Regions:
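Double-stranded RNA-binding/processing signature
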Residues: 1-128
C-alpha cells in the first residue's frame, strides 16, 4: 500500500511510537533512571496537551512545508473512535496531527526532516 493512501489515524499510530521513542531516548540520555520520574517527564512531551502546544509553536515559527502541513491537517481532521483521557477534542485532534507528521516522515524515510522536527520541538522545550 502506498503511504500516501494511509489515513491520518494510521500515520498518527506510527508517529506516536516514533515520538515516544525519541522522548525516551532523550530522557535516558539526560540521566533519568527512576521509572516514576521517566513516566512523569515523558508525559510533558507526549501528552495531547504537550503535542498540541508544540504544533501551535511550530506553526507560529513557519516550520512546516506545504506538504507537511497537509499531512498535519490530514491527521488533525481524521475522525477517531478513541479520545484523549485528559484533553478536549480540539487538543486531541491537534496532537493527532503532529503524530501523523512524525509517522509520515518516518514511513517516507525522511530522516533529516524528522530529526529537524524533533530538534525544533526540543528547542521549544518541555511542556509545563
Amino acid at each position: 500500500m502506498d503511504i500516501m493512501e494511509y489515513n491520518g489515524t494510521s500515520l498518527a499510530y506510527m508517529g506516536d511510537a516514533v515520538m515516544s521513542l525519541l522522548v525516551r531516548e532523550m530522557l535516558l540520555a539526560q540521566g533519568w533512571q527512576k521509572s516514576k520520574i521517566l513516566q512523569k517527564k515523558s508525559e510533558s512531551w507526549v501528552s495531547a496537551k504537550a503535542q498540541a502546544y508544540f504544533l501551535i509553536q511550530l506553526k507560529e515559527r513557519a516550520f512546516f512545508s506545504e506538504e507537511e502541513y497537509a499531512i498535519v491537517l490530514r491527521g488533525r481532521n481524521t475522525h477517531s473512535a478513541s479520545k484523549a483521557k485528559n484533553a478536549d477534542v480540539t487538543t486531541y485532534r491537534m496532537s493527532t496531527g503532529l503524530e501523523a507528521l512524525f509517522g509520515w516522515l518516518y514511513l517516507t524515510h525522511q530522516e533529516d526532516r524528522l530529526k529537524a522536527l524533533w530538534e525544533e520541538i526540543q528547542k521549544i522545550g518541555e511542556y509545563q
